[in-house]
């Protein structure tokens, strides 16, 4: 009986090689499974299916996990305004976990003996896929031909060409990972720390001049409207923001960080929707959360992003952090306006029923209604007690006159 193997199939070079090699050289019954987190068009998915069969797959399936990805991860990333190193919206990092979970589920459903993926031995994805598979289907063998054989792109292209599968893999200067939460760009100038990416490297080009106002509405921290149009489907709301923002070339940057395996890595990205949505959300929170809600939410959100990146999504503490993040959003309601311009944007204003700037006690820099001048002087004097006590004993440490 043939060994049944599920390949996490993106249609790229490494996974194409994996499908063909396992089917042709090993004689395995290969099932190509493409886990879509919102980055594939209908045409791309159709091409993936056709290519999988050309490569020798016994079966092919597209696993659409975009809605699950939003409900179980993106929602909390927005609650926490999660940006790794203050820059990167953790696009690929978070996607891979849910792709791995979907692949593992499918492998169990069809009774597979093994799971294969195309990760190399130098990046984060090998950790994310392997850890997910080890937890969800520990009885299955994990096959990684590119990693185990330390294969070069040239070797894989030559093998595919020699066996009748013609593609332009070798001509690609950059490799892209496209998803609902942004596009990552690797290769080319990325490999030289002294260089940035040229305009031509970005998939979405700035095609607008001037400026325009964008409004984003939130209900309990979740996006629910774009320019006045209400969305029940949050993924579609994200797509709407992406379309508008990308037309201005917004959301481009370069992320430099530490990989899970310990080396430094650099990646370019374009992520208009994440940058605009989280900027609007964070701005709204400044008006609607207390000082300490903001402070502690930022602390746990930083850990949430770190754990996502480090392939620890299945760690039980993540459910506890999600509960805290969700609780913090009960009063994060309202509409934020932003002004967009080529390659940038700025926040403009907030309209919220929970706006704490609007209160009956006092208006910053104008006047106090909730206390008297004597109250203010007493508050300041008591607040200075610890400092005054210290410097009474350490007058030599006071600033020079």
Which residues does each predicted region cover?
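Nucleotide-activated chemistry modules centered on ATP-dependent adenylation/adenylyltransferase
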Residues: 2-401
